[in-house]
């Protein structure tokens, strides 16, 4: 995938359109990487997809909804490394930046993006410095200091 992204960037815009037909085959690489929980390779593949989406987001138009659906499943999969999940979110954000019209037309893009962003914001990982302390703390909203007399 990296090789295709590098090659794609090296050719002129007019020639790039000839390679749009390869996108379905390229996207077919992603599901097996996710199914085998191969986070490192999935992370690299998603970064290559981000590069391609920055260069020519319109080439993804025919399969955009499928790509959104796949990316959402990656973001939701807590068995994958955080980096892979974040790269899937970055891919979706790249489309919003590069081709907002395409995102607007997709029936699930906006609601799923908002939901997944909020979900990722609430994830507390094992390696978070304050996670253990935060989980053990009392609810401050019940503390009398926070109530007005």
Where do the model's predicted regions map?
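Karyopherin-beta/Importin-beta family HEAT-repeat alpha-solenoid scaffold
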Residues: 1-149
